[in-house]
Amino acid sequence: MNLLLLTFGDNTDNHQQAVFAALSFMRDPHIRRVLVVTDRPDFYRWLCGTERNALSTEEGGEDASGKHGMAAAVEILPITAETLTSWQGPQQFFWRIKIQAVAMAVRQYPGQHLLYVDSDTFLAGSLADMVRQLGAGAAYMHCFENRLGDRNSRTLTRTRRALVGRTLEGIMLSGRHEMWNAGVIGLPASTAAERVAQALQLCDAMCATDCPRRLIEQFAFSLALQQGTLRSCQDVIGHYWGNKAAWNRLIAGFLAEARLKDETVAQAVARMGQVDWRALPLEHRQRRWVLRLKAVIDWALPPKKLRHFTPG
């Protein structure tokens, strides 16, 4: 199975997340290749290093089933700013690029299972069951979130009003259709090309309506993959979108130690076995009034003293 990550821009936090995610997935022998679609290939030179030797027992090179394997090969698929603009399509919907990156990987390696993950994810269990289910034709997304008919957010309400009753790409939309989190997308080799093409068509069709765009690419994948068996994987893959600041600190420390110790990629992959995935919450949301109070305090009580270096 191939793993796919999409990264872009100059924010090093995002790229460190991607490296950390890749290392966590490379512990599992079912991941044979890591594909990184990025406009900053220079950030992945260490990850692409040649010292990805087999993980020994002492290094912890095994998955939850006890199998040993090689650290996965890493392949960079470079893209340009022009590519990113083109991928946004005629309606210039930014997150259409996710669907295009998945389509690119499917074309690059047809006939192979593909697991796309957002950079802010990690593997904490075994992929053995997922691989079996993919082989049987099931697809994966991270987790079920809600149905279009649910009334738990303004964005969902606006989406429902714009889409329910429409027929898009042969699908008559109703309040029963489900929204799944697209932080993980697992595609079986047997239907990957077909489902990605359908997701792209659904995305473009929704962009042509007055539907709010924030969830369009996620709903497009959800609709396309609901045409078959769709499963959750949140019991083995963590998605810390709701607590990035805390996880970024953990990741920065992990990668700094890897470089200070001059670890090989294989050694860093093995050290992933020491990470306590339950130590930090995946989601940590403050009440709005707390955030406002902090802002007022910062404004009313500025630092007592600030001093910068002055060259002689």
Predicted feature locations:
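N-terminal anchoring/stem segment of glycosyltransferases
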Residues: 1-88, 107-110, 286, 290-312
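Conserved glycosyltransferase catalytic-site signature
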Residues: 15-19, 92-95, 99, 119, ...
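Secondary-structure boundary elements
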Residues: 27-32, 104-115, 189-194, 227
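A structural signal for short, well-ordered beta-strand segments and their strand-loop junctions
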Residues: 35-38, 113-118, 123, 140-141, ...
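GT-A fold catalytic core of metal-dependent nucleotide-sugar glycosyltransferases
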Residues: 98-150
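Conserved catalytic core of nucleotide-sugar-dependent glycosyltransferases
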Residues: 131-192
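Long, low-complexity C-terminal extensions of enzymes
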Residues: 250-312
